[in-house]
Structure formats: structure tokens, C-alpha cells
Amino acid sequence: MLKRFVNSIWEICQKDKFQRFTPVADAIDTFCYEPIHKSSSPPFIRDAVDVKRWMILVVVALFPATFSAIWNSGVQSLVYGSGNAQLMEAFLHISGFRSYLSFIFHDVGVFSVLWAGYKIFLPLLIISYSVGGACEVLFAVIRKHKIAEGLLVTGILYPLTLPPTIPYWMAALGIAFGVVVSKELFGGTGMNILNPALSGRAFLFFSFPAKMSGDVWVGSNPMKIKESLLAMNSTAGKSIIDGFSQSTCLHTLNSTPPSVKRVHVDAIASNILHMTHVPTQNVIQSQFSIWTESHPGLMLDKLTLEQLQSFVTSPLSEGGLGLLPTQFDSAYAITDVIYGIGKFSSGNLFWGNIVGSLGETSTFACLLGAIFLIVTGIASWRTMVSFGIGAFVTAWLFKIVSILIVGKHGAWAPARFFIPAYRQLFLGGLAFGLVFMATDPVSSPTMKLAKWIYGLFIGFMTILIRLINPAYPEGVMLAILLGNVFAPLLDYFAVRKYRRRRI
């Protein structure tokens, strides 16, 4: 029956007035069966894995990230949109798989989570494939060449890079830009310099920044989530400092001014976690002993929130730590990120129980995809490993250099430089970009040496943009696109080096 359907399409396209739609019939035939094209010149190689099946393997590798996107967006939407402060408290105090499963089964429900997630992700996926496919078909008909299989991967990668609240018309505009401008104008699949999915996201990021950053990470209706958070904070008596919010790790990092120093964060952490020793303990204790002369009977790890704020924001001459009062909430928030407190724990970051772009939240899901791509030989492990090494070493160097230059364990260096290097690998879209974006075979280098340099460069630029550039909370997208631009140059020098060695 399927073969009869395909043959009927071919018969229609053989008529004179429908011959221009031959690429459509060819694409349907190739998708349902196998390519009908034969090589016209040597070498003649028979291989069961054609481009279509190669693309399908990448889609299979994306299954864990896709399921994670559906599941996590559903959970976050139900919790943040509930208006129930007790439900939010229970969610934020989850510790371990047993408590997480208990919360899901008893408080929200599995089917409710899946349905809420599907309502968020499925429309974006349909828009991506529909609009992107229409652009592919249009150019194939105009140019009279076959429709390439590249959209199979781009169509699912693109919605995974978006926030769940993105308006549908913006999602359509972004995929159209990615397919047309970054791919078709360069000649189509295999000829593009930049990654189409990332190009579409970059277009939206610079054209509509308010819809791509800020409070856009939960549900599908930002206003509903905002009203729900206000109601929960009011019910629980939360302040702006310790209230519920949908801020991400990177948004918290990006909104922390350089005037928030490591000593401020350590002082807050020693009080929250009741730690008897933090890296800058000597500086804190020295100042605290002066401050307690006018506040007798207080202990550093047993201060109330008001007392802690008073100590941290008092002038240095009075025994305080000299932080501006208006920046205490930023220091309090970045403490959670640096020390992995509450919703920003390393477990939540690794497994994906956080807010963020749809496909970037779960590092574990990305690692499953990475293993599949490496085992099947689809993606380059060299690019992945070098990307991770570049990011880790750069983050570690920021910390070490700050300590060496400032002294006193970096007490008066910006706090943002002291996020543990391994946690940088879990933040934002680094894992997703490392596995699925940086390894794009078309826009990345082909030579082994070039792949190592390419990955190191992207990892370095990712952390540099995160920690230095206040305009962009995430550096992965810009770093990979910049790496795409330099990929041909890296290949050129790698080939020259190889030729010299051969001679």
C-alpha cells in the first residue's frame, strides 16, 4: 500500500505541469524506502548507512534529551504554576531519587507531567519541522535539486534550544532564518558554514532578547507563572532575598555585579550552611570580631537574615564586609550557585531538575546521547573531550589566577570567578552544545588536530563570555558559532602541517 502511494506521487510529478515538484516525490520515496540515486562516477562504494540513516542516528541520540525536555518542562510548569507555596517548598526540598519519585507520584502525577510537557514541546517541534520543511521544499523546487535530509536533525535540535515560553510565530521565524540564511543561501545541506539550529536561536536572541532571557523558563504563559510566584511568595511570607523565583544559574551569575566579592559569598555560606571554615574564614573572622564589639553576643554561623545582611553590608571600618545594601540579594543568590544550595545543587544540575531551555537542562541525558554518537562513530569524541577540557581548565584558571593576584584566598576578587570548574560543565547549554552542536560535521573541522584546537577554543570562549561579558548570560551559542567561522582556517593549517610531516 505504501509503495502504491509513492508510485502514485511519482506518476503525478511526471506530468508536465507538476514536474517542478519532482524533488518532493524524491524526498518521500527516499524517506519511505532507500535512495534511488546511483553514483555516476567512481569510487563505487556500497554502504547500508546513507545520509538519511546517518541523520536518523543523530535523532535517536536526541531521544533522551527530548524526553528530558518534555518531562522537566511538565514538572516545572505544574509546580511553578500551581500557586501553592507548600508544593513549591516540597519540590525544592527534594533530596534523592526516592523523594523525587514520591513527589511525582503523590503530588503532581506522572500523566499530568507528561501531558503538560507535551503541550509545551510538541507545538514547537511541529512548527520547526513544518516551517523548516516548507523552506527546504521551496528552495529544492526553485533550484530543481533533491531535498536533503539535513532538516531531520535541525528540526529537532532547534526547538530544544528554545525557552518553553517562546511565542510560536517567533519560533517559526527563527527556524526559517536558520534554514534559509545560514544554510540554503550557502548552497544547502553540506555547504553551510554555521550551524543552522544555532543560527536560528542566535537570530531570535539578538532580535527579541526579552523573549530569550529573563523570566521565560517555565510553562507557556509567563504572566501566569509570574502571578503564581507572587501568590506563593505572599503566602509563604518570602522576601525578595529568599523568595521563590524562576531564575537560572546563568541568569543569577550574569546578574551578579563584580562588586560582589568572594568574602561576601563565603560569609553568607558560613551562616546558611553553618560551616565552621570557609576559604576566606580568616578575613571574615577578623572583620566579624570588630563588628561584634557593637553587636555583642552574636555568633557568625547563627545570625538571622537581618543580622547577616547588616554584617555583610556594614562599612569595613565598622567591621562589616563593605557590600552595598542594594547588592545583598545578588550575593545571597550567587551563594546558592557557588555552593550548590537548594535548587542549584549539583544533583539537580546533572539530572536536569532545573529551569532552562528545553533541551539543555539534563547533563545526564546529553551524556547518554554522547555515548551513542561516539559508539556509532557519528560524532567526534575529540571535539567533545577538548571542549570539556577547554571549559574546565579556563574556569579553574579564573579561580587560581584570582587567588594569586588578589591574595587572601581571593577574598576581594569577584565572586563569579569561584564557581567550581566542574559545575561550569553542568550549567546552561554547555553539555547540550558539547554533544550535539559543536560536533556538527558540516560546520566543524574534519582534521584530527583541527578538532582538538576547535574544541579547546570553544570551551575557552564559553567560559570567557560567561564570566567576563555582562551582556550575554550564556557563552555556548556564541562560542560555537565563532568556532564555526574559524573551522575552515583550522582545517587549512592542519592540512599544511600534515603535508609537511609527510614530506
From Swiss-Prot:
Keyword Cell membrane (UniProt): yes
Membrane topology: Multi-pass membrane protein
FMN phosphoryl threonine: residues bearing it: T248
Transmembrane annotation, as ranges: 55-75, 120-142, 161-181, 186-206, 361-381, 387-407, 417-437, 452-472, 475-495
Tree of life domain: Bacteria
GO biological process, one term: sodium ion transport
Compartments (UniProt record): Cell inner membrane
Enzyme class: translocase
Keywords noted in UniProt: Cell inner membrane, Cell membrane, Flavoprotein, FMN, Ion transport, Membrane, NAD, Phosphoprotein, Sodium, Sodium transport, Translocase, Transmembrane, Transmembrane helix, Transport, Ubiquinone
Co-factor requirement: FMN
Molecular-function annotations in GO: FMN binding; oxidoreductase activity, acting on NAD(P)H, quinone or similar compound as acceptor
Entry EC number(s): 7.2.1.1
Gene Ontology CC: one annotated term: plasma membrane
Catalytic activity reported: a ubiquinone + n Na(+)(in) + NADH + H(+) = a ubiquinol + n Na(+)(out) + NAD(+)
Quaternary state and interactors: Composed of six subunits; NqrA, NqrB, NqrC, NqrD, NqrE and NqrF.
Role played: NQR complex catalyzes the reduction of ubiquinone-1 to ubiquinol by two successive reactions, coupled with the transport of Na(+) ions from the cytoplasm to the periplasm. NqrA to NqrE are probably involved in the second step, the conversion of ubisemiquinone to ubiquinol.
Similarity comment: family membership: Belongs to the NqrB/RnfD family.
Name recorded for this polypeptide: Na(+)-translocating NADH-quinone reductase subunit B
Species of provenance: Chlamydia felis (strain Fe/C-56) (Chlamydophila felis)
